[in-house]
Amino acid sequence: FCCPVIRYCCW
């Protein structure tokens, strides 16, 4: 899961 919102956060 990746959320390109204010910095990238992929897990």
Curated annotation (Swiss-Prot):
Tissue-wise expression: Expressed by the venom duct.
Post-translational modification: Contains 2 disulfide bonds that can be either 'C1-C3, C2-C4' or 'C1-C4, C2-C3', since these disulfide connectivities have been observed for conotoxins with cysteine framework V (for examples, see AC P0DQQ7 and AC P81755).
Protein name: Conotoxin au5b
Pfam families, alphabetized: Toxin_26 (PF08097)
Top-level lineage group: Eukaryota
Job description of the protein: Causes dorsal fins drooping in fish. No effect is observed when injected into mice.
Lineage: Eukaryota, Metazoa, Spiralia, Lophotrochozoa, Mollusca
InterPro entries with a match to the protein in the record: Toxin_26 (IPR012631)
Entry's free-text remark on domains: The cysteine framework is V (CC-CC).
Family note: Belongs to the conotoxin T superfamily.
Compartment(s) of residence: Secreted
GO molecular function: toxin activity
Keyword terms, alphabetized: Disulfide bond, Neurotoxin, Secreted, Toxin
GO cellular component: extracellular region
Main localization of the protein described in the UniProt heading: secreted
